[in-house]
């Protein structure tokens, strides 16, 4: 397994208690194999139940895309999810 690379984004609106936590973790494998897990958690109110959306992208083999291409797709997917809400 390669080195762990991780990123986390936190955002909140001024006029609401809603908080969005986005985090992505990926493990570059030997031979450019990539595993990416992306999680989004949305808490509407501090006392509300947690609503969680999990997106997982697993790429293996010679036809795998580059790390940059995969990260761009994950960022695009997270942006699309945020716009739908």
From Swiss-Prot:
It comes from Tomato golden mosaic virus (strain Yellow vein). Pathogenicity determinant. May act as a suppressor of RNA-mediated gene silencing, also known as post-transcriptional gene silencing (PTGS), a mechanism of plant viral defense that limits the accumulation of viral RNAs. May repress the AL61 promoter. Phosphorylated by Arabidopsis thaliana ASK7/ASK-eta mainly on threonine and serine residues. One of its GO terms (cellular component) is membrane. It is found in: Host cell membrane. Belongs to the geminiviridae protein AC4/C4 family. Interacts with Arabidopsis thaliana ASK7/ASK-eta and ASK6/ASK-zeta proteins. Keywords: Host cell membrane, Host membrane, Host-virus interaction, Lipoprotein, Membrane, Myristate, Phosphoprotein. It holds the Pfam family Gemini_C4. The keyword Aminoacyl-tRNA synthetase does not apply. It is a lipid-anchor. This is Protein AC4.
């Amino acid at each position: 397994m390669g080195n762990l690379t991780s990123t986390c984004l936190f955002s909140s609106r001024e006029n609401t208690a809603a908080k969005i936590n986005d985090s992505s973790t990926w493990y570059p494998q030997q031979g450019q194999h990539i595993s990416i897990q992306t999680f989004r958690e949305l808490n509407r109110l501090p006392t509300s139940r947690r609503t969680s959306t999990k997106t997982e992208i697993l790429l293996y083999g010679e036809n795998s895309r580059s790390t940059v291409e995969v990260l761009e797709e994950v960022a695009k997917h997270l942006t699309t999810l945020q716009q739908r809400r």
